[in-house]
From Swiss-Prot:
Record protein name field: Nucleoside permease NupC
Lineage: Bacteria, Bacillati, Bacillota, Bacilli, Bacillales
Keyword Transmembrane set for record: yes
Single annotated GO MF: nucleoside transmembrane transporter activity
Keyword Signal applies: no
Keywords of the record: Cell membrane, Membrane, Transmembrane, Transmembrane helix, Transport
Compartments where found: Cell membrane
């Protein structure tokens, strides 16, 4: 039965993308089928095989060491505030972002990341039926982040039509940045985080190919990556350290605000209607949770977490998943965890539109106009990845 429901779910989510398509007759079926097959193969390897366990284990172990090194710096500054017997979200989850961001800066300075991004993007362009710019952007978004990636493309932004701009922004919203992957791994199992990273990369291309199909002419398929201003090693290091700290503080501020507001709204709804706001959202999202393979008896609670992620952010939803006492089955936990690993939420519309507008005001206004369609597509990417996990777990 789970296979039947999962297949129906895939058809529904792809169908919802088709309904919103701006050019149904231009959709290229072959790349979509190839990428779906790759999603199933890679997802199965990562979740169900010894090779996958080895790769995920190595990835998680590496990040584990990085988090230990990050703790050295945190302990030095905050001393006794870090209690080994208690978990402080800001100290243990958010502040390591500072160290991870510093490492990314070093790898950028030494041209390691640009090399990896460029050639993985080139390989992806052979599979996804899109231009090299779109493929580069998807890989760069997964490493640099949804706003930082546009800085490397600022020369291209003014030359892009609305269709190509949508694809770039959709890729940025569907993925997550490497600087906060370590934070996710303190809240979710590493295998779910890694699987989501891979599935969302291809899922972003699949949904964008359906919602926003277009052909890139050979003469337009140019990739001119903006070289960063020449800086010394320590200038780059200092810049990325401060960027990492800004991210940690911004996420902390967003969490304080969103968690408090959701608690307030829940209190009002409980007093007036006898059910929390998140409970109502759970019923709204329950059919979608069911379609990704979650049993109906868990669908309402799972749907509540999924909806929380969309209206607030993934950190609030992950906190809800880990701390609210849900006793989900292993399969449901895997599906929900994979769904949560993306930037698909309302606040990301403002972040991406603001990042683009800071580089090109006209294009920033264009992004703001299709913001809801952007969130719609990115959310379908999360549902698609979750449905695939539901089928292969």
């Amino acid at each position: 039965m789970k296979y039947l429901i999962g297949i129906i779910g895939l058809i529904v989510f792809l169908g919802l993308a088709w309904i919103a398509s701006s050019g149904k007759k231009r959709i290229k079926i072959r790349p979509i089928v190839v990428m779906l097959i790759l999603q199933f193969i890679l997802g199965y390897i990562l979740l169900n095989t010894g090779i996958g366990n080895f790769l995920v284990g190595g990835f998680a172990k590496g990040f584990g060491y990085l988090l230990e090194y990050a703790a050295e710096g945190i302990n030095f500054v905050f001393g006794g505030l870090v209690n080994a017997d208690q978990t402080t979200f800001f100290m243990n989850v958010l502040l390591p972002i500072v160290f991870i961001s510093a490492l990314i800066g070093i790898l950028q300075k030494w041209k390691v990341l640009p090399f990896i991004i460029r050639y993985i993007g080139l390989a992806l362009s052979k599979v996804n039926g899109m231009g090299r710019l779109e493929s580069y952007n998807a890989v760069a978004s997964a490493i640099l982040g949804q706003s930082e990636v546009f800085i490397s493309l600022k020369k291209e932004l003014g030359l892009l039509n609305q269709q190509r701009l949508y694809t770039l922004c959709a890729s940025a919203m569907s993925t997550v940045s490497m600087s906060i992957v370590g934070a996710y791994m303190t809240m979710l199992k590493p295998e779910y985080v890694v699987t989501a990273l891979v599935l969302n990369l291809f899922g972003g291309f699949i949904i964008a190919s359906i919602i926003n199909p277009y052909e890139v002419a050979k003469e337009e398929d140019m990739l001119r990556v903006e070289e960063e201003e020449k800086q010394s090693f320590f200038e780059v290091l200092g810049e990325y350290i401060l960027d990492g700290f800004k991210v940690a503080v911004v996420v902390a501020a967003m969490l304080i605000g969103f968690v408090a507001i959701i608690a307030l709204i829940n209190g009002i709804f409980n007093a007036v209607f006898g059910i929390s706001f998140q409970g109502i959202l759970g019923y709204v999202f329950a059919p979608f949770a069911f379609l990704v393979g979650i049993p109906w008896n868990e669908a309402v609670n799972a749907g509540s977490i999924m909806a929380t992620k969309m209206v607030s952010n993934e950190f609030v939803a992950m906190t809800s998943l880990t701390q609210n006492g849900f006793h989900f089955s292993g399969r449901t936990t895997a599906i929900v965890s994979v769904f949560l690993v993306s930037f698909a939420n309302f606040s990301s519309i403002g972040i991406i539109a603001g990042a683009v507008k800071g580089l090109n005001e006209k294009q920033g206004n264009v992004v703001a106009r299709f913001g809801l369609k952007l969130l719609y597509g990115a959310t379908l990417v999360s549902f698609l990845s979750a449905a695939i996990v539901g089928l292969i777990y």
